[in-house]
């Protein structure tokens, strides 16, 4: 009977220790996951803000060209240039439909990542069309009489 009581007394503290260790591991896992999730969210928000700034800069470059050199070149008429097709190409470049700015409006990490991807596409669009518009402006200016 003493042996039975002794083994029961030894098992009970071991069981309590095991439960406490498991509880500590679970709590640490939950806090670790939350910290990881928060870090991912913060990184996504920061990336979206950077992408938004890139779109703003690319849009400004495009608008400066449209309102500056492209506007002056578009004011020319066919009599003012040697090759009238350069004016047609310029007008075609000026009539493109601009992308709609969506911004960083999201509630979760996936939403911010999606918004970042869209903003990066918009920045690329503005950069590409700024270059093609500049080429069209240069062609009109080279064709001036």
Regions found by a protein language model. Give the residues of each.
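Amphipathic alpha-helical assembly segments used for oligomerization, scaffolding, or translocation
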Residues: 1-145
